[in-house]
Protein backbone atom coordinates (compact mmCIF):
# COMPACT_ATOMS: atom_id res chain seq x y z
CA UNK A 1 0.00 0.00 0.00
CA UNK A 2 3.07 2.27 0.14
CA UNK A 3 2.32 3.95 -3.20
CA UNK A 4 -1.16 4.95 -2.04
CA UNK A 5 0.02 6.60 1.18
CA UNK A 6 0.85 9.58 -1.03
CA UNK A 7 -2.86 10.12 -1.76
CA UNK A 8 -3.71 10.35 1.95
CA UNK A 9 -0.62 12.39 2.83
CA UNK A 10 -1.58 14.92 0.14
CA UNK A 11 -5.22 14.92 1.24
CA UNK A 12 -4.34 15.66 4.87
CA UNK A 13 -1.72 18.27 3.98
CA UNK A 14 -4.06 20.00 1.54
CA UNK A 15 -6.70 20.33 4.26
CA UNK A 16 -4.13 21.79 6.66
CA UNK A 17 -3.05 24.27 3.98
CA UNK A 18 -6.63 25.11 3.09
CA UNK A 19 -7.58 26.01 6.67
CA UNK A 20 -4.33 27.88 7.23
CA UNK A 21 -5.33 30.06 4.28
CA UNK A 22 -8.53 31.01 6.10
CA UNK A 23 -6.50 33.25 8.41
CA UNK A 24 -4.40 34.68 5.59
CA UNK A 25 -5.08 38.13 4.10
CA UNK A 26 -4.50 36.61 0.66
CA UNK A 27 -7.12 33.92 1.26
CA UNK A 28 -9.82 35.44 -0.96
CA UNK A 29 -7.53 35.54 -3.99
CA UNK A 30 -6.11 32.11 -3.27
CA UNK A 31 -9.55 30.63 -2.62
CA UNK A 32 -10.89 31.85 -5.98
CA UNK A 33 -8.04 30.15 -7.79
CA UNK A 34 -7.49 27.08 -5.61
CA UNK A 35 -10.78 26.26 -3.90
CA UNK A 36 -10.79 22.83 -5.58
CA UNK A 37 -7.08 22.15 -5.15
CA UNK A 38 -7.73 19.23 -2.79
CA UNK A 39 -10.21 17.48 -5.09
CA UNK A 40 -7.62 15.59 -7.21
CA UNK A 41 -6.89 13.31 -4.23
CA UNK A 42 -10.59 12.52 -3.87
CA UNK A 43 -10.79 11.89 -7.59
CA UNK A 44 -7.80 9.54 -7.38
CA UNK A 45 -9.63 7.47 -4.77
CA UNK A 46 -12.78 7.45 -6.91
CA UNK A 47 -10.90 6.35 -10.01
CA UNK A 48 -9.05 3.67 -8.06
CA UNK A 49 -12.38 2.10 -7.09
CA UNK A 50 -14.17 2.71 -10.39
CA UNK A 51 -16.41 5.57 -9.29
CA UNK A 52 -17.63 7.62 -12.23
CA UNK A 53 -19.17 11.07 -12.40
CA UNK A 54 -19.63 13.59 -9.61
CA UNK A 55 -19.72 12.69 -5.94
CA UNK A 56 -23.26 11.98 -4.72
CA UNK A 57 -23.54 14.61 -1.99
CA UNK A 58 -21.89 18.00 -1.49
CA UNK A 59 -23.81 19.10 1.60
CA UNK A 60 -24.38 18.14 5.22
CA UNK A 61 -27.68 17.45 6.96
CA UNK A 62 -30.71 16.31 5.02
CA UNK A 63 -30.13 13.33 2.74
CA UNK A 64 -30.57 14.51 -0.89
CA UNK A 65 -33.35 11.95 -1.49
CA UNK A 66 -35.55 13.62 1.15
CA UNK A 67 -35.27 17.38 0.64
CA UNK A 68 -38.98 17.52 -0.17
CA UNK A 69 -40.26 15.93 3.02
CA UNK A 70 -42.57 18.20 5.02
CA UNK A 71 -45.18 16.53 7.20
CA UNK A 72 -44.90 13.13 5.55
CA UNK A 73 -42.96 9.93 6.20
CA UNK A 74 -41.02 7.86 3.68
CA UNK A 75 -39.46 4.42 3.93
CA UNK A 76 -36.14 3.72 2.24
CA UNK A 77 -33.11 1.57 3.05
CA UNK A 78 -29.86 3.04 4.30
CA UNK A 79 -26.44 1.85 5.36
CA UNK A 80 -25.33 3.91 8.36
CA UNK A 81 -21.71 4.45 9.36
CA UNK A 82 -20.65 6.08 12.61
CA UNK A 83 -17.01 6.98 13.19
CA UNK A 84 -15.49 8.31 16.39
CA UNK A 85 -12.02 9.82 16.46
CA UNK A 86 -10.50 9.81 19.95
CA UNK A 87 -7.15 11.22 20.93
CA UNK A 88 -7.24 14.55 19.13
CA UNK A 89 -8.00 16.34 22.41
CA UNK A 90 -4.39 15.71 23.43
CA UNK A 91 -3.43 18.35 20.89
CA UNK A 92 -4.79 20.93 23.34
CA UNK A 93 -2.02 20.01 25.79
CA UNK A 94 0.65 21.07 23.33
CA UNK A 95 -0.78 23.75 21.02
CA UNK A 96 -2.77 26.97 21.06
CA UNK A 97 -6.51 26.73 20.43
CA UNK A 98 -6.05 28.06 16.90
CA UNK A 99 -3.64 25.27 16.04
CA UNK A 100 -5.76 22.63 17.79
CA UNK A 101 -8.73 23.72 15.69
CA UNK A 102 -6.57 23.65 12.56
CA UNK A 103 -5.41 20.07 13.06
CA UNK A 104 -8.74 18.72 14.28
CA UNK A 105 -10.53 20.33 11.37
CA UNK A 106 -8.01 18.87 8.92
CA UNK A 107 -8.53 15.38 10.40
CA UNK A 108 -12.35 15.61 10.28
CA UNK A 109 -12.29 17.18 6.81
CA UNK A 110 -10.01 14.45 5.45
CA UNK A 111 -12.37 11.83 6.88
CA UNK A 112 -15.31 13.56 5.22
CA UNK A 113 -13.53 13.59 1.86
CA UNK A 114 -12.78 9.87 2.10
CA UNK A 115 -16.45 9.10 2.80
CA UNK A 116 -17.62 11.43 0.02
CA UNK A 117 -15.23 9.73 -2.39
CA UNK A 118 -17.39 6.63 -1.93
CA UNK A 119 -20.62 8.60 -2.37
CA UNK A 120 -21.34 8.81 1.33
CA UNK A 121 -23.62 11.58 2.59
CA UNK A 122 -22.42 13.41 5.71
CA UNK A 123 -25.48 13.69 7.91
CA UNK A 124 -24.04 15.02 11.11
CA UNK A 125 -20.75 16.04 12.75
CA UNK A 126 -20.82 15.52 16.51
CA UNK A 127 -17.56 16.85 17.97
CA UNK A 128 -14.97 14.24 16.97
CA UNK A 129 -17.60 11.89 15.53
CA UNK A 130 -19.32 11.76 12.14
CA UNK A 131 -22.55 10.04 11.05
CA UNK A 132 -22.51 9.07 7.37
CA UNK A 133 -25.25 7.59 5.20
CA UNK A 134 -24.44 5.30 2.29
CA UNK A 135 -27.16 4.61 -0.23
CA UNK A 136 -29.80 6.43 -2.24
CA UNK A 137 -32.78 5.60 -4.42
CA UNK A 138 -30.67 5.14 -7.57
CA UNK A 139 -28.08 2.86 -5.92
CA UNK A 140 -28.29 -0.88 -5.39
CA UNK A 141 -28.33 -1.87 -1.73
CA UNK A 142 -25.29 -4.12 -2.12
CA UNK A 143 -23.29 -1.26 -3.63
CA UNK A 144 -24.20 1.04 -0.73
CA UNK A 145 -22.84 -1.51 1.75
CA UNK A 146 -19.72 -2.11 -0.36
CA UNK A 147 -19.11 1.65 -0.49
CA UNK A 148 -19.39 1.81 3.29
CA UNK A 149 -16.91 -0.99 4.03
CA UNK A 150 -14.46 0.28 1.38
CA UNK A 151 -14.63 3.81 2.80
CA UNK A 152 -14.28 2.57 6.37
CA UNK A 153 -11.29 0.42 5.42
CA UNK A 154 -9.51 3.34 3.75
CA UNK A 155 -10.35 5.58 6.72
CA UNK A 156 -8.59 3.13 9.02
CA UNK A 157 -5.70 2.89 6.58
CA UNK A 158 -5.47 6.71 6.51
CA UNK A 159 -5.23 6.69 10.31
CA UNK A 160 -2.67 3.87 10.38
CA UNK A 161 -0.37 5.67 7.93
CA UNK A 162 -0.75 9.42 7.41
CA UNK A 163 -2.27 10.34 10.77
CA UNK A 164 -0.03 7.97 12.75
CA UNK A 165 3.02 9.50 11.11
CA UNK A 166 1.78 13.02 11.85
CA UNK A 167 1.05 12.35 15.54
CA UNK A 168 4.35 10.56 16.07
CA UNK A 169 6.19 13.49 14.50
CA UNK A 170 4.50 15.69 17.14
CA UNK A 171 5.52 13.25 19.94
CA UNK A 172 1.87 12.39 20.57
CA UNK A 173 0.12 9.06 20.79
CA UNK A 174 -1.65 8.10 17.53
CA UNK A 175 -5.40 8.50 17.27
CA UNK A 176 -7.80 5.71 18.10
CA UNK A 177 -10.54 5.47 15.50
CA UNK A 178 -13.55 3.21 15.91
CA UNK A 179 -16.13 2.66 13.18
CA UNK A 180 -19.55 1.01 13.33
CA UNK A 181 -21.67 0.05 10.31
CA UNK A 182 -25.15 -1.42 9.97
CA UNK A 183 -27.81 -1.79 7.27
CA UNK A 184 -31.55 -1.30 7.52
CA UNK A 185 -33.81 -2.45 4.68
CA UNK A 186 -36.64 -0.40 3.19
CA UNK A 187 -39.26 -1.40 5.76
CA UNK A 188 -36.84 -0.79 8.65
CA UNK A 189 -35.90 2.85 7.96
CA UNK A 190 -38.35 5.75 8.30
CA UNK A 191 -37.38 9.19 7.00
CA UNK A 192 -39.16 12.19 8.53
CA UNK A 193 -38.78 15.63 10.05
CA UNK A 194 -37.94 16.12 13.73
CA UNK A 195 -38.34 19.36 15.64
CA UNK A 196 -40.47 22.49 15.27
CA UNK A 197 -40.81 25.15 12.60
CA UNK A 198 -37.44 26.77 11.99
CA UNK A 199 -35.63 24.34 14.31
CA UNK A 200 -35.76 20.90 12.77
CA UNK A 201 -33.95 18.28 10.78
CA UNK A 202 -34.86 15.47 8.40
CA UNK A 203 -33.29 12.24 9.54
CA UNK A 204 -33.75 8.49 9.72
CA UNK A 205 -35.62 6.61 12.42
CA UNK A 206 -34.19 3.12 12.53
CA UNK A 207 -32.70 0.81 15.10
CA UNK A 208 -30.01 0.05 12.52
CA UNK A 209 -28.86 3.68 12.42
CA UNK A 210 -28.81 3.64 16.23
CA UNK A 211 -26.87 0.38 16.21
CA UNK A 212 -24.14 1.85 13.98
CA UNK A 213 -23.28 4.14 16.88
CA UNK A 214 -23.43 1.22 19.32
CA UNK A 215 -21.14 -0.85 17.09
CA UNK A 216 -18.65 2.00 17.00
CA UNK A 217 -18.62 2.03 20.79
CA UNK A 218 -18.07 -1.76 20.88
CA UNK A 219 -15.34 -1.80 18.23
CA UNK A 220 -11.74 -2.32 19.39
CA UNK A 221 -9.38 0.60 18.79
CA UNK A 222 -8.67 1.21 15.11
CA UNK A 223 -11.16 -1.46 14.07
CA UNK A 224 -14.50 -1.68 12.27
CA UNK A 225 -17.52 -3.39 13.82
CA UNK A 226 -20.27 -4.52 11.46
CA UNK A 227 -23.84 -5.54 12.19
CA UNK A 228 -25.42 -8.86 11.30
CA UNK A 229 -27.24 -7.39 8.28
CA UNK A 230 -23.98 -6.31 6.64
CA UNK A 231 -22.81 -9.90 6.43
CA UNK A 232 -26.28 -11.25 5.64
CA UNK A 233 -26.52 -9.02 2.59
CA UNK A 234 -22.99 -9.46 1.21
CA UNK A 235 -22.09 -12.90 2.65
CA UNK A 236 -18.55 -11.80 3.53
CA UNK A 237 -15.90 -14.55 3.80
CA UNK A 238 -15.07 -15.59 7.35
CA UNK A 239 -11.40 -14.73 6.81
CA UNK A 240 -12.43 -11.05 6.83
CA UNK A 241 -14.57 -11.37 9.99
CA UNK A 242 -13.79 -12.19 13.60
CA UNK A 243 -15.52 -12.32 16.98
CA UNK A 244 -14.56 -9.67 19.50
CA UNK A 245 -12.74 -11.11 22.52
CA UNK A 246 -12.76 -9.46 25.95
CA UNK A 247 -10.96 -10.46 29.13
CA UNK A 248 -13.12 -11.35 32.12
CA UNK A 249 -11.15 -12.31 35.21
CA UNK A 250 -8.28 -13.37 33.00
CA UNK A 251 -10.49 -15.53 30.77
CA UNK A 252 -11.19 -14.82 27.09
CA UNK A 253 -14.91 -14.22 26.53
CA UNK A 254 -16.50 -13.97 23.10
CA UNK A 255 -18.77 -10.97 22.53
CA UNK A 256 -21.04 -12.08 19.68
CA UNK A 257 -24.19 -10.02 20.20
CA UNK A 258 -25.13 -6.37 20.47
CA UNK A 259 -28.70 -7.42 21.33
CA UNK A 260 -29.55 -10.52 23.28
CA UNK A 261 -33.02 -10.13 24.74
CA UNK A 262 -36.20 -12.15 24.97
CA UNK A 263 -38.37 -9.61 23.14
CA UNK A 264 -35.94 -8.51 20.38
CA UNK A 265 -33.98 -11.72 20.09
CA UNK A 266 -30.32 -11.81 19.17
CA UNK A 267 -28.53 -9.52 16.75
CA UNK A 268 -24.88 -10.28 16.16
CA UNK A 269 -21.82 -8.13 15.58
CA UNK A 270 -18.40 -8.95 14.18
CA UNK A 271 -15.08 -7.22 13.70
CA UNK A 272 -14.41 -6.54 10.03
CA UNK A 273 -10.72 -7.27 9.39
CA UNK A 274 -9.96 -4.27 7.19
CA UNK A 275 -6.21 -4.97 7.01
CA UNK A 276 -6.75 -8.46 5.57
CA UNK A 277 -9.45 -7.11 3.28
CA UNK A 278 -7.26 -4.37 1.75
CA UNK A 279 -4.28 -6.72 1.58
CA UNK A 280 -6.28 -9.10 -0.64
CA UNK A 281 -6.74 -6.59 -3.48
CA UNK A 282 -4.88 -7.14 -6.73
CA UNK A 283 -4.88 -3.41 -7.49
CA UNK A 284 -3.39 -2.42 -4.09
CA UNK A 285 0.20 -3.15 -3.03
CA UNK A 286 0.56 -5.52 -0.05
CA UNK A 287 1.31 -4.04 3.38
CA UNK A 288 4.60 -5.93 3.45
CA UNK A 289 6.76 -7.03 0.51
CA UNK A 290 9.65 -8.33 2.61
CA UNK A 291 9.38 -11.92 1.38
CA UNK A 292 7.95 -11.16 -2.05
CA UNK A 293 10.20 -10.90 -5.10
CA UNK A 294 7.26 -10.19 -7.37
CA UNK A 295 3.91 -8.76 -6.33
CA UNK A 296 0.90 -6.90 -7.68
CA UNK A 297 0.32 -4.31 -8.88
CA UNK A 298 4.00 -3.40 -9.30
CA UNK A 299 5.05 -6.45 -11.33
CA UNK A 300 1.76 -8.01 -12.41
CA UNK A 301 -1.97 -7.51 -12.05
CA UNK A 302 -5.21 -9.29 -12.88
CA UNK A 303 -7.83 -7.20 -14.67
CA UNK A 304 -11.43 -8.09 -15.39
CA UNK A 305 -13.95 -7.14 -18.07
CA UNK A 306 -17.69 -7.70 -18.31
CA UNK A 307 -18.54 -9.17 -21.72
CA UNK A 308 -21.67 -7.69 -23.27
CA UNK A 309 -22.41 -10.28 -25.95
CA UNK A 310 -25.63 -8.57 -27.04
CA UNK A 311 -23.83 -5.34 -27.99
CA UNK A 312 -20.53 -7.09 -28.79
CA UNK A 313 -18.68 -4.93 -26.30
CA UNK A 314 -16.84 -5.18 -23.00
CA UNK A 315 -16.55 -2.99 -19.93
CA UNK A 316 -13.86 -3.10 -17.30
CA UNK A 317 -14.96 -4.14 -13.82
CA UNK A 318 -12.88 -2.41 -11.15
CA UNK A 319 -12.08 -4.75 -8.31
CA UNK A 320 -14.73 -4.63 -5.57
CA UNK A 321 -15.98 -1.22 -6.64
CA UNK A 322 -19.52 -2.60 -6.91
CA UNK A 323 -21.44 -5.87 -7.05
CA UNK A 324 -22.01 -7.81 -10.26
CA UNK A 325 -25.29 -9.45 -11.12
CA UNK A 326 -25.49 -13.21 -11.58
CA UNK A 327 -25.08 -14.83 -15.00
CA UNK A 328 -22.64 -12.20 -16.30
CA UNK A 329 -19.81 -13.30 -18.60
CA UNK A 330 -16.36 -12.19 -17.48
CA UNK A 331 -12.91 -12.06 -19.06
CA UNK A 332 -9.87 -12.10 -16.76
CA UNK A 333 -6.41 -11.13 -18.03
CA UNK A 334 -3.04 -11.29 -16.32
CA UNK A 335 -0.86 -8.33 -17.24
CA UNK A 336 2.92 -8.58 -16.68
CA UNK A 337 4.78 -5.32 -16.06
CA UNK A 338 8.21 -6.61 -14.97
CA UNK A 339 10.34 -7.99 -17.79
CA UNK A 340 12.43 -9.87 -15.23
CA UNK A 341 9.41 -11.97 -14.30
CA UNK A 342 10.10 -15.11 -16.33
CA UNK A 343 7.71 -18.04 -15.99
CA UNK A 344 7.09 -21.37 -17.66
CA UNK A 345 3.41 -21.96 -16.93
CA UNK A 346 0.23 -20.24 -15.72
CA UNK A 347 -2.68 -21.80 -13.84
CA UNK A 348 -6.05 -20.27 -12.94
CA UNK A 349 -8.15 -21.19 -9.92
CA UNK A 350 -11.60 -20.09 -8.73
CA UNK A 351 -12.13 -19.66 -4.98
CA UNK A 352 -15.76 -19.05 -4.06
CA UNK A 353 -17.17 -18.22 -0.63
CA UNK A 354 -20.65 -18.02 0.79
CA UNK A 355 -23.65 -20.22 1.45
CA UNK A 356 -24.85 -20.46 -2.16
CA UNK A 357 -21.53 -21.76 -3.49
CA UNK A 358 -21.19 -24.07 -0.50
CA UNK A 359 -24.65 -25.53 -1.15
CA UNK A 360 -23.71 -26.32 -4.76
CA UNK A 361 -20.28 -27.64 -3.71
CA UNK A 362 -18.57 -25.12 -5.96
CA UNK A 363 -16.21 -23.51 -3.46
CA UNK A 364 -12.89 -24.17 -5.25
CA UNK A 365 -11.94 -25.54 -8.64
CA UNK A 366 -9.16 -25.31 -11.23
CA UNK A 367 -9.67 -23.67 -14.62
CA UNK A 368 -7.71 -26.41 -16.39
CA UNK A 369 -8.78 -25.42 -19.91
CA UNK A 370 -6.91 -22.11 -19.50
CA UNK A 371 -3.62 -23.54 -18.23
CA UNK A 372 -0.73 -21.78 -19.94
CA UNK A 373 -2.81 -18.78 -21.02
CA UNK A 374 -2.71 -15.23 -19.67
CA UNK A 375 -6.49 -15.03 -19.75
CA UNK A 376 -9.56 -17.03 -18.76
CA UNK A 377 -13.33 -16.73 -19.01
CA UNK A 378 -15.85 -17.30 -16.24
CA UNK A 379 -19.47 -16.51 -15.37
CA UNK A 380 -20.89 -15.01 -12.18
CA UNK A 381 -23.11 -17.42 -10.26
CA UNK A 382 -23.21 -17.07 -6.46
CA UNK A 383 -23.82 -14.27 -3.98
CA UNK A 384 -20.71 -13.33 -2.03
CA UNK A 385 -17.14 -12.11 -2.35
CA UNK A 386 -15.22 -14.50 -4.59
CA UNK A 387 -11.70 -14.65 -6.02
CA UNK A 388 -10.06 -15.54 -9.30
CA UNK A 389 -6.50 -16.64 -8.56
CA UNK A 390 -3.60 -16.89 -10.96
CA UNK A 391 -0.33 -18.77 -10.28
CA UNK A 392 2.94 -18.47 -12.20
CA UNK A 393 5.34 -21.44 -12.24
CA UNK A 394 9.01 -21.83 -13.13
CA UNK A 395 10.59 -24.57 -15.24
CA UNK A 396 10.63 -26.89 -12.20
CA UNK A 397 6.89 -26.40 -11.65
CA UNK A 398 7.46 -24.34 -8.51
CA UNK A 399 5.32 -21.28 -7.81
CA UNK A 400 7.13 -18.02 -8.53
CA UNK A 401 4.29 -15.73 -7.50
CA UNK A 402 0.54 -15.44 -7.63
CA UNK A 403 -2.21 -12.84 -7.69
CA UNK A 404 -5.91 -12.85 -6.86
CA UNK A 405 -8.79 -10.66 -7.99
CA UNK A 406 -11.82 -10.22 -5.73
CA UNK A 407 -15.33 -9.52 -6.97
CA UNK A 408 -18.67 -9.10 -5.26
CA UNK A 409 -21.71 -10.84 -6.75
CA UNK A 410 -25.19 -9.98 -5.54
CA UNK A 411 -28.73 -10.26 -6.92
CA UNK A 412 -29.96 -7.61 -4.42
CA UNK A 413 -32.74 -9.88 -3.27
CA UNK A 414 -31.38 -10.77 0.12
CA UNK A 415 -33.19 -11.52 3.36
CA UNK A 416 -31.96 -9.47 6.31
CA UNK A 417 -32.99 -9.10 9.93
CA UNK A 418 -35.90 -6.75 10.64
CA UNK A 419 -35.78 -5.74 14.29
CA UNK A 420 -38.64 -4.24 16.24
CA UNK A 421 -42.26 -3.83 15.14
CA UNK A 422 -43.10 -2.94 11.53
CA UNK A 423 -45.97 -0.56 10.75
From Swiss-Prot:
The protein's UniProt keywords, in alphabetical order, are:
Antiviral defense, Cytoplasm, Lyase, Manganese, Metal-binding, Nucleotide-binding
What EC number(s) does this enzyme carry?
A: 4.6.1.6
Task: Locate the residues binding a ribonucleoside 5'-triphosphate.
Answer: 82
Q: Name one Pfam family in it.
A: Guanylate_cyc
Required cofactor(s): Mn(2+)
Positions bound to Mn(2+) 1? 84, 128
Q: Where is this region: AGS-C domain?
A: 290-409
Q: Which residues bind Mn(2+) 2?
A: 84-85, 128
- State the family it belongs to: Belongs to the adenylyl cyclase class-4/guanylyl cyclase family. Pyrimidine cyclase subfamily.
Assembly with partners or alone: Homodimer.
For domains, the record's comment is: Has an N-terminal nucleotide cyclase domain and a C-terminal nucleotide sensor domain (AGS-C).
- UniProt protein name: Cytidylate cyclase
Q: What organism does this protein naturally occur in?
A: Staphylococcus aureus
Instruction: Write the lineage as a comma-separated list.
Output: Bacteria, Bacillati, Bacillota, Bacilli, Bacillales
